[in-house]
Amino acid sequence: MKELSLSPNGNAPMSLKYSHKQHNEFLILTDWIGRNWLQIFEGNTDFYTSHYWDLMKQLWQNPVPVRKTDALGFMTSIKSPHTAAKYIDAAIRQGYLIEKENPDDARSRLLSLTPEMRERLDKHFDSIITELCDTAERIKKE
């Protein structure tokens, strides 16, 4: 029997494409991703937030250092640049980020992941893809 839910706009009911069991497989995957994310920061729950996910993901996607003012905007759920700077400063203090002078503009600073953090994230994303493929296979079998 197909379950019903509201459409994305919240109006009309729609049939679900996947079963409760398949949805549960997805939730197991997201829990696994969260636990793995926490291991990147050696269990430090201060870094278990969407703010750091946004920041680290964007910095990982940029192979070259980015202006600190640009990095402030990576944390989409934080509206205050001052507050975003506090998060960045905490990551610098923990040794996850490198801040250096911008050789092209003395008024700005550049941010990048430390080599160790980049390697941790490389491994994290690699293991997620493996787990995602395994989860997809389990979902297909249902």
Q: Where on the chain are the PLM-derived regions?
A:
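N-terminal leader segment of winged-helix/HTH proteins
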Residues: 1-46
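Short helix-coil-helix linker/hinge
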Residues: 45-53, 65
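Short amphipathic alpha-helical elements of helix-turn-helix/winged-helix folds
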Residues: 54, 58-62
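Short acidic, hydrophobic short linear motifs in intrinsically disordered regions
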Residues: 65-75
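A short, conserved structural fragment
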Residues: 92-102
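Short, cationic-aromatic polyanion-contact patches
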Residues: 102-124
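Amphipathic alpha-helical dimerization/coiled-coil segments
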Residues: 122-142
